[in-house]
Curated annotation (Swiss-Prot):
It comes from Homo sapiens (Human). This is Flavin reductase (NADPH). Keywords: Cytoplasm, NADP, Oxidoreductase, Phosphoprotein, Transferase. It comes from the Eukaryota. One of its GO terms (cellular component) is intracellular membrane-bounded organelle. Changing residue 78 to G: Decreased affinity for coenzyme A. The gene is BLVRB.
């Protein structure tokens, strides 16, 4: 079944905004859950439906997931590196809502640190990485069709669409542009080749 209706969680983050814009431009009917709708762009591609609420509130998540064909998860903590459970608790609510509404495809972004030796994670990023690990475990054990996207450093280079995707390991470059990352998140909706895999998108930008 072709995916037409999608929910995006984390649509107002750096990667979320470009993923949202690309999704609308590609013809998807997009629903977003946002705490503050003023963080959505006032111009350019707009989501079809905006739910104002919190990923930590199960009812808000349920309302966002109802009627969708697939879910994209780009939850983050912005620049807050303190200990958190927002991403993993949010993922629990998303999984519960997906199961309740018969939605079985989820593409979620964590980070390449999950592919590394855990002892090599920079100490200041350890707390956020710990919650990424918890979120990944929730999704991996959910029984859903889950694509784990584990990008390296997210840059601001223009969209190329020419990135490399490495399965279950690290690739040739240590960077992916946020635009290419968004492009890849959407590409995962059109194929089952990445289901059940950890994916590392990267590109050698000029």
């Amino acid at each position: 079944m072709a995916v037409k209706k999608i929910a995006i969680f984390g649509a107002t983050g750096q990667t979320g905004l470009t993923t949202l814009a690309q999704a609308v431009q590609a013809g998807y009917e997009v629903t977003v859950l946002v705490r503050d709708s003023s963080r959505l762009p006032s111009e350019g591609p707009r989501p079809a439906h905006v739910v104002v609420g919190d990923v930590l509130q199960a009812a808000d998540v349920d309302k966002t997931v109802a009627g969708q064909d697939a879910v994209i998860v780009l939850l983050g903590t912005r620049n807050d590196l303190s200990p958190t459970t927002v991403m993993s608790e949010g993922a629990r609510n998303i999984v519960a809502a997906m199961k309740a509404h018969g939605v079985d495809k989820v593409v979620a972004c964590t980070s390449a640190f999950l592919l590394w030796d855990p002892t090599k994670v920079p100490p200041r990023l350890q707390a956020v990485t710990d919650d990424h690990i918890r979120m990944h475990k929730v999704l991996r054990e959910s029984g859903l069709k889950y694509v784990a996207v584990m990008p390296p450093h997210i840059g601001d280079q223009p969209l190329t669409g020419a990135y490399t995707v490495t399965l279950d390991g690290r690739g040739p470059s240590r960077v992916i542009s946020k635009h290419d990352l968004g492009h890849f998140m959407l590409r995962c909706l059109t194929t089952d080749e990445y289901d059940g895999h950890s994916t590392y998108p990267s590109h050698q930008y000029q």
